[in-house]
């Protein structure tokens, strides 16, 4: 157990692992047991619908107190503006609601509602970014962009993902040159 930042731990040759939401998982497990005890009907969590309109109505009203990743005031405000209608909307909000990508949330919301035009800098980006309204939200999208537009191998794309995700400046600088030359060549 440590309070040190990830890079400091890695520089020492140690592995840092974040265990998030374990208390929530325990709460879910206990809730399922209580439902079975009280009602005599076991609930299979993997069979719970991911597209229940009543659940989306709660998200659309920002009634998410106690829901991991969705309970902050800022997130509730954005959910009310977004009016999520599918599971993908919720996944995107969790991915965007962090320093840096957060500035893209208003544009994401406007694009979802047709209030801002979705444009792609290159035709090859359309199938990659279509589900997220032309905004790169996920690491997997960034990897696919490097493969499609710059000719990166899967290993090279993963190196780029790691450089971006861990903010390793020296590796980013190294990858940028490869990315630009690959895009020019393609």
Residue ranges and their predicted role:
Residues 1-186:
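Mg2+-dependent phosphoryl-transfer active-site scaffold
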């Amino acid at each position: 157990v440590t309070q040190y930042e990830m890079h400091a731990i890695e520089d020492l040759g140690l592995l840092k692992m974040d265990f998030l939401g374990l208390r929530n998982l325990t709460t879910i497990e206990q809730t399922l047991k209580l439902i079975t005890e009280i009602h005599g009907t076991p609930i299979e969590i993997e069979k719970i619908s991911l597209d229940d309109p009543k659940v989306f109505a709660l998200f659309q009203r920002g009634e998410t107190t106690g829901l991991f990743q969705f309970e902050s005031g800022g997130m509730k405000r954005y959910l009310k503006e977004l009016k999520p209608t599918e599971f993908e909307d919720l996944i995107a909000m969790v991915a965007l609601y962090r320093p840096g990508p957060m500035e893209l949330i208003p544009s994401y919301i406007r694009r979802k509602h047709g209030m801002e035009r979705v444009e792609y800098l290159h035709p090859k980006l359309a199938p990659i970014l279509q589900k997220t309204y032309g905004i790169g939200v996920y690491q997997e999208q960034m990897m696919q962009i490097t493969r499609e537009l710059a000719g990166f191998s899967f290993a090279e794309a993963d190196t780029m993902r790691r450089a971006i995700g861990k903010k390793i400046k020296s590796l980013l600088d190294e990858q940028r040159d490869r990315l630009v030359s690959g895009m020019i060549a393609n």
